[in-house]
């Protein structure tokens, strides 16, 4: 994931900062506890595509 892209894009739900999880190929919003998939290098920033992070999952 290009670090310049991470500086530009934001969570579509709260407009918060996203961080990249290299292991799971996901963009993480810590504020909303959502993980957005990255498919073929393309972030899928659709709320209905995101998975909720369990309370015990730390990223």
From Swiss-Prot:
Gene3D superfamilies named among the record's database cross-references: 2.20.25.10
Cystine pairs: none
Alphabetized SUPFAM superfamilies for the sequence: Trm112p-like
Source superkingdom: Bacteria
Pfam families associated with the record: Trm112p (PF03966)
A GO cellular component entry from the record: cytosol
Family recorded in the similarity comment: Belongs to the UPF0434 family.
Protein name in the entry: UPF0434 protein plu1633
